[in-house]
Amino acid sequence: MKTLSASACLAIWERGAGHHPARQALHLLNAAWPEVGPDMLAQLSLGQRNLLLLRLREQLFGSQIESVVGCPGCGQQVELTLDVRDIGGQPDQEFLEPKAPYFFSQGDYQIHFRLPNSLDLLAIGPDQEATIARNALLARCLVLAQQGDQTISSDQLPLEIEAQLIDQMAQADPQADIELAITCPFCARAWQVGFDVIHYLWRELTAWAYRFLGDVHTLASEYGWAEGDILALSPWRRQAYLAIIRGT
């Protein structure tokens, strides 16, 4: 994994601002794993993608994740603190390859499928109604479906086979849809909440970018330096100049 500089992070943020979250994720992965290649990264399963994003998040902002969620029982705000390594492991080089298609059979149905990836999310788009998006995703990920010796399409699958397909996908790629188990310290209500890795990471990147650009503005205003000169400074030197300006 490549270490990303401040200027690289700014470029990624600017390039991905306002884009589909799947596109934002690919911008980050392409910058951090250039040796893998954009085509290969785009074909990684969503669980593989999320684990790489968590690893990158640890490089950029540290391993500790903090958030606040509202308790559905008492309405109190519950603070969460967790480690990225508690959510997923550290992927090795073999992990950086798309997974082969999977197979299961039930009754006289034989189902071959692959796992959803970033290209699927980009093709479906962010604004589709949930049922339409799910059906489109299943259609894209269904490699081959047969009833006996007859090939059938995804919309011909019985509901129980469709449910089995969704369950098989979830079991094969558990980090694709990360759920955090939470217990409220105020009322002891237990529930689960989804953790959207790219949403959280991009929000952090945006907050960092605004803080960093504020520092650039401060240094440029005080010393008349160009943005490129400020970005070329080491983080320690930038902070030293900022401390001088602020008198700390």
Residue ranges: model-predicted function:
Residues 1-248:
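Long C-terminal interaction/binding lobes of large macromolecular proteins
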